[in-house]
A protein has these predicted regions:
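Beta-strand-rich structural segments
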Residues: 25-48, 56-58, 82, 130-147, ...
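Edge beta-strands of extracellular beta-sandwich domains
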Residues: 106-117, 206-224
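Short amphipathic beta-strand segments in non-cytosolic proteins
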Residues: 55-70, 155-171
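Short glycine/proline/serine/threonine-rich loop/turn segments at secondary-structure transition edges
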Residues: 88-97, 188-197
Length: 277
């Protein structure tokens, strides 16, 4: 005789977990500090989604020499940024900075980590003005040996800081002295005092990673930051007066014809002779 199983079947709950992706970079500044930036995303329901509210831990060093630098919560863009002062940073025997960004895991989000290893270096930017010629001299210095050493044959770019992003002004390659000179255009829009912020950058270098240096100079054209009503113009939000006036006249003429036609139809209907019954 077959036996029936009277026990209730247990429901197996399958919890979906997501593996986060950490994009991690370091930016070495001209004051010898380092910005650590991590962007955390995960593929959720087929869409790459930025993860907010996650605690990212930043450390420097390897194995037994690991030193905690700090913790940052990701913002609405999934980004966590930590600025590290020079006295917080330690290098290995090769003069490299070994950074790690790690996430311990939370709810359905799995743990993850990402490593970045770069040689210690510094980018310097010096403004030079000769008559009407404006230039900046950019120098790349290797600090991994403890003493400054010029780095030749390295590509870099110079930008001007704008409200939302930076505008590239030129690029160059360092010479044997580790220097490159880039010309700056005249009459760039500046702030109310005519100041512009110039940035020298090296991006994604195989040895040094990302480096940045900034300098502010009164080389721009003053642009008022006061809110003023713009004059009426074709390219503005307020058109010239002749445009709405012309439009109003044309629309009045068109709709006026319709009104006259409808009025005449009603008048003709009233004047239609009635047939005797």
């Amino acid at each position: 005789m077959a036996q029936t199983d009277s026990s209730a079947k247990e429901e197996v709950k399958v919890t979906t977990t997501y593996a986060p992706i950490i994009a991690f970079i370091s930016v070495q500044k001209s004051d010898n500090s380092v910005d650590l930036k991590s962007t955390v995303q995960a593929k959720i329901r087929g869409t790459l989604t930025k993860l907010t509210g996650l605690k990212i831990e930043f450390t420097v060093g390897t194995d037994s020499t690991v030193k905690k630098l700090g913790e940052v919560i990701t913002d609405s863009r999934g980004v966590a940024i930590l600025n590290c002062k020079p006295d917080q940073l330690t290098t290995d025997k090769e003069g490299k900075l070994n950074f790690k960004a790690s996430f311990a895991g939370k709810d359905s989000i799995e743990s993850a980590e990402e490593l970045v290893s770069v040689k210690r270096a510094r980018l310097e930017i010096t403004p030079v003005k000769e008559d009407s010629l404006l230039t900046v001299k950019v120098k790349l210095i290797d600090l991994s040996t403890g003493t400054g050493t010029a780095v030749p044959e390295t590509d870099l770019g110079v930008f001007v800081k704008r409200m939302f992003s930076s505008l590239k002004l030129g690029e160059g390659k360092t010479d044997e002295a580790g220097e490159a000179t880039i010309e700056i255009p005249n009459k760039l829009p500046g702030d109310a005092q005519g100041n512009i912020t110039l940035l020298a950058k090296i991006d994604e270098n195989e040895v040094y990673g990302n480096l940045e240096a900034a300098v502010t100079q009164p080389w721009g054209t003053p642009v008022s930051d006061e809110l003023k009503a713009l004059p009426r113009a074709l390219w503005g939000t307020l058109p010239p007066l002749w445009m709405p006036i012309t439009f109003l006249i044309l629309m009045t003429a068109v709709w006026g014809h319709y009104i006259v036609i409808i009025f005449e139809l009603f008048r003709l209907r009233k004047e239609e002779p009635k047939t005797a019954s």
